[in-house]
Amino acid sequence: MSKPPPKPVKPGQVKVFRALYTFEPRTPDELYFEEGDILYIADMSDTNWWKGTCKGKTGLIPSNYVAEQAESIDNPLHEAAKRGNLSWLRECLENRVGVNGLDKAGSTALYWGCHGGHKDVVDMLLAQPNIELNQQNKLGDTALHAAAWKGYADIVELLLVKGARTDLRNNEKKLALDMATNAQCASLLKKKQAQGIVRTSSNADEYLDDEDSD
């Protein structure tokens, strides 16, 4: 029995597959790929021929071939971040895989990069212009919660420099500081929170007479 066809791509959304077999093109427009290659499908508007990219080359792929001879990768950016696979992460971003996509747990790729302590992955994700730093997953945890819980002070520092919020509580009402498992992480978070308190009080004095203030 053949598998049901994959759901069509929404505009701006990229579907990712891993080829199970090598495909030999019959025309110059078709895309050559080998078993195990990652395929990025950006255009499924033609039901018979999908436009895809593999190893930086773009071409047409028969849709029935992808449906039957390739396995769908639902959250490729998350997988790359979990594994600390920087080259795959870069390829996903170059092929416009959404940087803030959520997996079934409601977590972002940034969360998993922080959870795994993959500093180079976190660096690359934080360099994306529209990265969402403070996304909370189904447990209410942010990337900062994950880094603090796992004790990665270097990643905690990266997130704080980028502007991650320290005041978000998870479903257990815990701040990232409450989950910090080592003194270095706790110290960084306490320092940041103290700065926030000082800034808030000084702003109140500074803008007391400002009509634009809330």
From Swiss-Prot:
Which coarse location class describes where this protein primarily resides?
cytoplasm
Spans of repeat ANK: 72-101, 105-135, 139-168
SMART domains for this protein: ANK, SH3
Signal peptide region: none
> Could you tell me which SUPFAM superfamilies the record lists for this protein?
Ankyrin repeat (SSF48403), SH3-domain (SSF50044)
Recorded hits in CDD domains, A to Z, give: SH3_OSTF1 (cd11772)
Domain named SH3 is located at 12-71
What name does UniProt use for this protein? Osteoclast-stimulating factor 1
Q: What is the lineage of its organism?
A: Eukaryota, Metazoa, Chordata, Craniata, Vertebrata
